[in-house]
């Protein structure tokens, strides 16, 4: 099977790779299993030294890695550079914190001595998406490796050069070859690998169907999985909100990564008394964004990653408008080479629209008007997803009602939903289960062993 790198800005094939054969995959699995037997016993200081070196390599060759991301999936250069910086940050964070997070935890019981010992699981299969091709991998790999596990990466098929580059970074930093390897294989093969006895656990970031298939394969073998799937995050604006600040944040909250982010704000739920002003100003802000060549530092919105993603967005917008939604800006693909779609705002979306509860994975925002806080919370929860949420209000009582009432893995008050190495990240409902980042993120990849000495 051939795996091609296609530039989404031009549609031109850049490079083609041959997928790994079954023999090659087996060899990588054997090497991973063999490496784990010694890697798990290395001191935290050694693994931390290598991880800090990986951070150095990320920063020293930042422009190279950023250009690679832009070439393969269309992310704008400034955002790609920011992604590389964030990867270096998460490496240093876990290099510093892993030993503290995984220290034996003393528990007072009737025993003369009792504690929890945290030990690595083994070989972990990571299936990762194209939208944040470096960040999604490093936020898994940094804690997993520091805990003493070894990783196998199956990356999205449209970012093979990013996948190979990440393995190169870890090996150049000093990690044994078998500690982190890249598999160039199809998604179906990745799910089938969960049945292999050499793999102890798996993690997947991607679509809901991909997550369901992966979890099903893991369940048949009773193997642990961490899933971070889709999201359709609400961005709630109440009448007492600081509109200037909310609007300033609303644009990157929706349009980061060309709108292709699971944790992006996708549904803007605004109280009626300020709704028209908010939507008019948001429309102008969207129209001011520059759509174009992602390799230029002046570009705000680059192309969507693939023609299929563009086709999905075109169909969703057409269906939403046909159902009665008001298109305030955008609404049609650009007539030029590449997978370009302009920033689009659709308001007055009726509940009977076939796209009402769908995730829009592109530069499209939906706008809703509500009368009060209770309606805002109900509308925010009226979807099958529960990844993140943003809410804007200066009233402390309303803030607490929003925090407790919204069904999501994270709620940001007067701020933009984001993933930060210091705090756990993950969702509920069909957005997945398990947590990444923070202490909870590293605990996903260890066995919490109870020790009781009578």
UniProtKB/Swiss-Prot annotation:
<comment type="similarity">
    <text>Belongs to the aldehyde dehydrogenase family.</text>
</comment>
<feature type="binding site">
    <location>
        <begin position="130"/>
        <end position="131"/>
    </location>
    <ligand>
        <name>NADP(+)</name>
    </ligand>
</feature>
<dbReference type="InterPro" id="IPR047110">
    <property type="entry name" value="GABD/Sad-like"/>
</dbReference>
<feature type="binding site">
    <location>
        <position position="229"/>
    </location>
    <ligand>
        <name>NADP(+)</name>
    </ligand>
</feature>
<dbReference type="InterPro" id="IPR015590">
    <property type="entry name" value="Aldehyde_DH_dom"/>
</dbReference>
<comment type="pathway">
    <text>Amino-acid degradation; 4-aminobutanoate degradation.</text>
</comment>
<feature type="binding site">
    <location>
        <position position="359"/>
    </location>
    <ligand>
        <name>NADP(+)</name>
    </ligand>
</feature>
<dbReference type="GO" id="GO:0004777">
    <property type="term" value="F:succinate-semialdehyde dehydrogenase (NAD+) activity"/>
</dbReference>
<comment type="function">
    <text>Catalyzes the NADP(+) dependent oxidation of succinate semialdehyde to succinate.</text>
</comment>
<feature type="active site" description="Proton acceptor">
    <location>
        <position position="228"/>
    </location>
</feature>
<dbReference type="GO" id="GO:0036243">
    <property type="term" value="F:succinate-semialdehyde dehydrogenase (NADP+) activity"/>
</dbReference>
<dbReference type="InterPro" id="IPR016161">
    <property type="entry name" value="Ald_DH/histidinol_DH"/>
</dbReference>
<dbReference type="InterPro" id="IPR016162">
    <property type="entry name" value="Ald_DH_N"/>
</dbReference>
<feature type="binding site">
    <location>
        <begin position="206"/>
        <end position="207"/>
    </location>
    <ligand>
        <name>NADP(+)</name>
    </ligand>
</feature>
<feature type="active site" description="Nucleophile">
    <location>
        <position position="262"/>
    </location>
</feature>
<protein>
    <recommendedName>
        <fullName>Probable succinate-semialdehyde dehydrogenase [NADP(+)]</fullName>
        <ecNumber>1.2.1.79</ecNumber>
    </recommendedName>
</protein>
<dbReference type="GO" id="GO:0004030">
    <property type="term" value="F:aldehyde dehydrogenase [NAD(P)+] activity"/>
</dbReference>
<dbReference type="Pfam" id="PF00171">
    <property type="entry name" value="Aldedh"/>
</dbReference>
<dbReference type="InterPro" id="IPR016163">
    <property type="entry name" value="Ald_DH_C"/>
</dbReference>
<keyword id="KW-0560">Oxidoreductase</keyword>
<dbReference type="GO" id="GO:0009450">
    <property type="term" value="P:gamma-aminobutyric acid catabolic process"/>
</dbReference>
<dbReference type="InterPro" id="IPR044148">
    <property type="entry name" value="ALDH_GabD1-like"/>
</dbReference>
<keyword id="KW-0521">NADP</keyword>
<feature type="binding site">
    <location>
        <begin position="154"/>
        <end position="157"/>
    </location>
    <ligand>
        <name>NADP(+)</name>
    </ligand>
</feature>
């Amino acid at each position: 099977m051939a795996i091609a790198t296609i530039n989404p800005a031009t549609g031109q094939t850049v490079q083609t790779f041959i997928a790994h054969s079954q023999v090659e995959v087996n060899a990588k699995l054997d090497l991973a299993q063999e490496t784990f037997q010694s890697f798990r016993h290395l001191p935290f200081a050694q693994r931390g030294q290598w991880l800090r070196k990986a951070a150095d390599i990320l920063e020293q060759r930042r422009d190279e890695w950023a250009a690679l991301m832009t070439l393969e999936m269309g992310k704008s250069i400034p955002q790609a550079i920011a992604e590389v910086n964030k990867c270096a940050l998460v490496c240093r964070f876990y290099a510093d914190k892993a030993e503290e997070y995984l220290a034996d935890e003393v528990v007072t019981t009737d025993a003369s001595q009792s504690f929890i010992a945290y030990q690595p699981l083994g070989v972990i299969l990571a299936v990762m998406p194209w939208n944040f091709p470096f960040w999604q991998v490093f936020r898994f790999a940094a804690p997993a490796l520091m805990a003493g596990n070894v990783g196998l990466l199956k990356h999205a098929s449209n970012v093979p050069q990013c996948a190979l580059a990440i393995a190169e970074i870890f090996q150049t930093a000093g990690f044994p070859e078998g500690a982190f390897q890249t598999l160039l294989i199809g998604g179906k093969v990745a799910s089938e690998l969960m049945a292999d006895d050499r793999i102890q656990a798996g993690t997947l970031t991607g679509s809901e169907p991909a997550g369901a298939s992966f979890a099903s394969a893991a369940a048949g073998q009773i193997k642990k999985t961490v899933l971070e799937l889709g999201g359709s995050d609400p961005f709630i604006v109440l009448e007492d909100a600081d509109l200037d600040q909310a609007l300033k944040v609303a644009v990157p909250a929706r349009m980061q990564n060309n709108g292709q982010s699971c944790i992006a704000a996708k549904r803007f739920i605004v109280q009626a008394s300020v709704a028209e002003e908010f939507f008019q100003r948001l429309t102008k802000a969207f129209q001011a964004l520059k759509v174009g060549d992602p390799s230029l530092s002046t570009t705000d919105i680059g192309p969507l990653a693939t023609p299929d993603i563009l086709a999905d967005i075109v169909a969703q917008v057409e269906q939403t408008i046909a159902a009665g939604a008001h298109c305030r800006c955008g609404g049609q693909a650009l007539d030029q080479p590449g997978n370009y779609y302009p920033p689009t705002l659709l308001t007055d979306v009726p509940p009977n629209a076939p796209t009402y509860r769908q995730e829009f994975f592109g530069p499209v925002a939906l706008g809703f008007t509500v009368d009060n806080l209770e309606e805002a919370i109900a509308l925010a929860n009226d979807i099958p997803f529960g990844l993140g949420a943003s809410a804007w209000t200066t009233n402390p009582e309303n803030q607490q009602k929003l925090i407790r009432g919204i069904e999501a893995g994270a709620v940001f008050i007067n701020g933009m939903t984001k993933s930060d190495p210091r705090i756990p990240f993950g969702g509920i409902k069909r957005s997945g289960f398990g947590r990444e980042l923070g202490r909870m993120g590293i605990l996903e990849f260890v066995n919490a062993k109870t020790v009781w000495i009578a």
